[in-house]
Swiss-Prot record:
Highest classification ranks of the organism: Eukaryota, Viridiplantae, Streptophyta, Embryophyta, Tracheophyta
Disulfide bonds: none
Gene (UniProt): ADH
Complexes and interactors: Homodimer.
Name of the protein: Alcohol dehydrogenase
Residues reported in the UniProt entry to bind Zn(2+) 2: 100, 103, 106, 114
Residues where NAD(+) binds: 50, 203-208, 227, 232, 273, 296-298, 323, 373
Gene Ontology MF, one: S-(hydroxymethyl)glutathione dehydrogenase [NAD(P)+] activity
Species per Swiss-Prot/TrEMBL record: Fragaria ananassa (Strawberry)
Amino acid sequence: MSSTEGKVICCRAAVAWEAGKPLVIEEVEVAPPQANVVRVKILYTSLCHTDVYFWEAKGQNPLFPRIYGHEAGGIVESVGEGVTDLKAGDHVLPVFTGECKECDHCKSEESNMCDLLRINTDRGVMLNDGKSRFSIKGKPIYHFVGTSTFSVYTVTHVGCLAKINPQSPLDKVCILSCGISTGLGATLNVRKPKKGSTVAVFGLGAVGLAAAEGARMAGASRIIGVDLNSNRFEEAKKFGITEFVNPKDHKKPVQEVIAELTNGGVDRSIECTGNIQAMIPAFECVHDGWGVAVLVGVPHKDAVFTTHPMNFLNERTLKGTFFGNYKPRTDIPSVVEKYMNKELEVDKFITHQLPFSQINKAFDYMLKGEGIRCIITMEE
C-alpha cells in the first residue's frame, strides 16, 4: 500500500483559467479514487491538437478553470473500490475514450464506441457523483475527457486506462494513447490496404503521418500525400509517403489529379483534416469497383458532405472511424507491443521535448505548426 493511498495529494498542474490564455502551473489537490476509479502519477504527457482546440474554446461550451491533457503515460498510484485488473505500480496509458466491457458496443467485435465511457468533451466532472477530483483551496477545477494529464497526479475511470508492458518506455509510447493510434488504426483496422496497393493520405499532420505509417507497415507500393503545405513533404517521406500532391499546384480538382496518377484512382484513401474540401475528393479519388475511403477528421458541426450517388453505385465504399477502431483496454497494449517488436516506429513522431514548467512553449509549437509531437516531462 502506498503512503498516499486514501489521502488527498497535492501536486503541480497546468491550469487553464481562461480560453486561449497561457496555462498557469498551480498547486492543486487531487482527491483519492472512488469506486471503479484509479489515481495515476503522470510521468510524461504530450500535446494533441484536440487540447489546443478546446483550450481555444472552439469546440464546446466554455468550461473553465480546467486541466487539459489526454495523451500520456504514467504509473498507478492507487485504485478505488471494485478495481480488480489494475494495482499500484502498473504502467498505464490514459485514453480519452473508454471500454467498460459490459455494454453492447464493448461486447461487439465491430465497435469501440462504449456507451458508458465514450468521449464527452463537455463533461468536466467524474461519472460517480458529478463532482471534480481537482481543487485549489476548495475551489473545483474541471476535468477534460476523463484524463486531465497536465497534472502530476490525475484520476480516471478504470475503463479509460490501458495496462501496458512495464518495459516499454513511457516517454515514447505515451503518444500511442490518441492521435498516432487513431491514424494507424484507421489504416490497419478499417482501410486494410493489401500489399502492393496504392494509398492516398489527405492531411499530413500527426494523424495523417500515422495513417501513412500504417500503409507502410501494410506493404503499400505507393503512398500519395495530399496537403496544402508543400514544406511537409520532406518530413513525410520518413513515414512512407512516396509522392506528394498540393491541390494549390493544379487547376483541376485533386481527385482528378490522383485518378490520372493512378490509372483511375487509388485502392484506399484516408482523410485526416476534418475539412469537407478534403473529405469529398478523398472519397471520389478511390478506384471504382473496390476503392475504400476512410474519414478520420472531425468536421465543423454544420458541415455537409455532398457527392453524386453514382460514386456509391459504382462500388466505391466510404467508411468512418473513431480512435482507429481500437478498444482502449483490449487493443492498445498490442499497439505498444508493435513498437517493442520494432514493427512500429514511434520515435520519428517525437520532434520536441520540454520540461513541465515550459508547457506553454508546446502550445506555441502547435499553433505555429512546428514539429509533430512534443513530449513534456512532468518531473524536473
